[in-house]
């Protein structure tokens, strides 16, 4: 199996690559690509870690080589958020980066599972879909927006609030991957009851957790380490599923639902990517209202991505 990370020299890319080097199954190839000249050094650095995962670095002229034969491609490339910016401010820069990388994926490994990490995910996944359609290789079962960070944050915050081990807490998070489009289903957390005030404050904190990190880093970056962990978790789940294990993860995929063209759902993963999009269950009144009020914004984010490629 071969996994490629595009944008491997950045904050998320390096954290993600480290976790994959230490956790991918023995015999996996890990291809690290970046336009930054440091990327061969990142690969050499990681190659000194004693695991049976072969790491190779590829510079800006070697994208095709990095992608050829890849089974999974992860894209964290792009510029990070700075204080005062929201994820939509990133669109102007990151949209073009994602478009170019996805075009190369279409040309060199069209069968690969493609995992989009670059923000704004609500929009960049739509860009990826349209770019793949334009090349005639779109398979909706193989395109994922990585929203796992919202899930691990929700599990951490609930665990901390109730003094539980977050590793044993399961919080469904549906919708999109920015602001109010992030919808944690706290009514479905097993064995834990919340007051209305707790639901409101937890929901707001989960939705604004990215900003919490950006502000805490005081201009020094965004959520790179936790995002690296979230992306690694999703990638490793996908690897396990491709090897025949039964795995469910929440991820932003194309759906046939009335909610939006793309929506984060619980998804059963398998050898060919999406095996089955599972229902997200019954919503509380609070969650139903929150969902209804954010759908227009989410649909607008998606439309922006579709129009970016087609206009």
Curated annotation (Swiss-Prot):
Q: Which InterPro entries match?
A: L-lactate/malate_DH, Lactate/malate_DH_C, Lactate/malate_DH_N, Lactate_DH/Glyco_Ohase_4_C, Malate_DH_AS, Malate_DH_type1, Malate_DH_type1_bac, NAD(P)-bd_dom_sf
Question: The organism sits in which domain of life?
Answer: Bacteria
* Gene Ontology BP terms: malate metabolic process; tricarboxylic acid cycle
State the protein's purpose. Catalyzes the reversible oxidation of malate to oxaloacetate.
From what organism does this protein derive?
A: Pseudoalteromonas atlantica (strain T6c / ATCC BAA-1087)
Q: What is this protein called?
A: Malate dehydrogenase
Lineage from the top down?
Bacteria, Pseudomonadati, Pseudomonadota, Gammaproteobacteria, Alteromonadales
Task: Tell me its family.
Answer: Belongs to the LDH/MDH superfamily. MDH type 1 family.
| Catalytic residues as annotated in Swiss-Prot or TrEMBL | 177
**Oxidoreductase: is it a keyword of this entry?**
yes
EC code(s) of this entry:
1.1.1.37
- Which keywords accompany this UniProt record? NAD, Oxidoreductase, Tricarboxylic acid cycle
- Supply the gene name: mdh
* Binding annotation for substrate: 81, 87, 119, 153
Q: What class does this enzyme belong to in the EC scheme?
A: oxidoreductase
Q: Which reaction does it catalyse?
A: (S)-malate + NAD(+) = oxaloacetate + NADH + H(+)
Q: Name one GO cellular component term.
A: cytoplasm
Q: Which residues bind NAD(+)?
A: 7-13, 34, 94, 117-119, 227
One matching Pfam family is Ldh_1_C
Gene Ontology molecular function: L-malate dehydrogenase (NAD+) activity
Record's subunit section = Homodimer.
């Amino acid at each position: 199996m071969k996994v490629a990370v595009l944008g491997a020299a950045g904050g998320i890319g390096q954290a993600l690559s480290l976790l994959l080097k230490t956790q991918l199954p023995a015999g996996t190839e890990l291809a690290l690509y970046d336009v930054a000249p440091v990327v061969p050094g990142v690969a050499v650095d990681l190659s000194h870690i004693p695991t049976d995962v072969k790491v190779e670095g590829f510079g800006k002229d070697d994208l095709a080589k990095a992608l050829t034969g890849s089974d999974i491609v992860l894209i964290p490339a792009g510029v990070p958020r700075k204080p005062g910016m929201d994820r939509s401010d990133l669109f102007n820069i990151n949209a073009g980066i994602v478009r170019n990388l996805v075009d190369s994926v279409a040309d060199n490994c069209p069968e690969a599972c493609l995992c989009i990490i670059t923000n704004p995910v609500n929009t960049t996944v739509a860009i990826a879909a349209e770019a793949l359609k334009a090349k005639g290789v779109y398979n909706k079962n193989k395109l994922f927006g990585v929203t796992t960070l919202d899930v691990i944050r929700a599990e951490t915050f609930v665990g901390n609030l109730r003094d539980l081990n977050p590793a044993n807490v399961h919080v469904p998070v549906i919708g999109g991957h920015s602001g109010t489009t992030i919808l944690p289903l706290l009514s479905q957390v097993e064995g834990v009851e919340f007051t209305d005030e707790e639901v409101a404050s937890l929901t707001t904190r989960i939705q604004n957790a990215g900003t919490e990190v950006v502000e805490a880093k005081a201009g020094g970056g965004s959520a790179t380490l936790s995002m690296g962990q979230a992306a690694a978790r999703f990638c490793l789940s996908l690897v396990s599923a491709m090897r025949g294990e039964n795995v469910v993860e929440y991820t932003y995929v194309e759906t046939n639902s009335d909610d939006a063209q793309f929506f984060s759902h619980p998804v059963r993963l398998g050898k060919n990517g999406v095996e089955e999009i599972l229902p997200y269950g019954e919503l509380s009144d609070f969650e139903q209202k929150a969902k209804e009020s954010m759908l227009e914004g989410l649909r607008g984010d998606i439309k922006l991505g579709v129009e970016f490629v087609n206009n």
